[in-house]
Amino acid sequence: ASSICDGFIIRRHVLMTPFYALRHQVRRLDEELCGNGGKYPTGDVLFSGEGKRIVLGKPIAEGGEGSVFTSHAASASPLVAKLYHPNQRMRWREQKLRLMCSRPIRSPCVAWPREILYDELRRFVGVLMPRADGVPLGAFAFHAELLTNQFPSWTRYDLTRLCLNLSASVHTLHRCGVVLGDLHPGNVLVSPDGSICWVDADSFQVEDYPCSVGTERFRAPELRGNYGDFLRARSHDAYALSVLLFMTLTLGLSPFARQGGEGDMREAARKGALPYPFASYRPPAGFYPPDTPGRYVWSYLPRKLRDALGHNLTCVQRRDLRPRVMPGYLARCLLQYLRDMEPGGGRDHPMYRDLLHDRPCPPHSLLVQMTPNVCTDCGILFREAPDDVARRLRQSHAKSLCKLCIRRRSALNQATRNPTTNH
């Protein structure tokens, strides 16, 4: 058996049987502190559960739960040590990590905990995990300039391959009985070839141990209360993944952003009010996408992918009887999208591989007449039909300008000619 991921196909001979059972009732967590309250600098020695010496290297990062260090240990692969802050060394965390280390998931798409770390008196202080290389998704994928600086050769084909790997990796973890819970762009590292690795796996939801953290933008609208008080379902991951895929495909545009509605995106998300049409859904009156290049990406996506993402973003599970589309189906839609962009496919045209667009998707008969150009105002690559060039010159825009920048200039000129006077 095989899974779509990381170069499209990864063998999952050990991933066919779920490692963890999905539960419906959160366990009562033992909040007793079990550590010694000490802090550990570079050079200190800790011990694994089997008694192996682990020497702390340089600090890599620090967060709300703890600090991450490089480590020196007798291991075939490089490892990092995550040491929890003294107030985070609870008994339930040690118990959860013991469960996770006893049933390790060996997959390149997740940095799964390997061994628990103790001090010389065998008091719990942290966990040992594989070191993952790459760039955090949120550090480059949500702005065209950052993306081209990080990966200069990437096109929409590479961006779609990245989305495929994101979907397939979540599907793989779901098959193992794991719910990610806190699924957001800071928890996934991306390599130049588009392969990905989820980090901070110690916060994943396994069995009846909840994921006690979350990110509001990726929180399913039907969820209420504190994150640690309930168990999440795979459907909640599907919602967060759909938000992440939309933002990645549009280079940072929130799915619920709209013209004139900057302050109420969370309310729109709660109601499932998307400003983009799909299938039989039409946006509410007055809901228009923001006037940015990312808005047009939606019209270039294949219909099945649009329908799946749109359904996941607009349905609220308490009032919609249709379940959300799962990551495995999203991965299949994205794989077909990739194949369509390859030579001989239905989307085998350079325009489909542009990162951003200044117009809705044109009919195929018009594509062959369009020539590439670079906007002198915003810098995006856009394409012009012969009629577009003539119209731009008639409007006295001698420089190459995309349609969005022509509209902005026209609006600015209009405002200059008709200034508003306050009496």
Language-model region placement:
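Conserved structural core of kinase catalytic domains
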Residues: 111-158
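Activation segment/activation loop of eukaryotic-type protein kinase catalytic domains
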Residues: 189-218
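Conserved C-lobe activation region of Hanks-type protein kinase-like domains
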Residues: 248-299
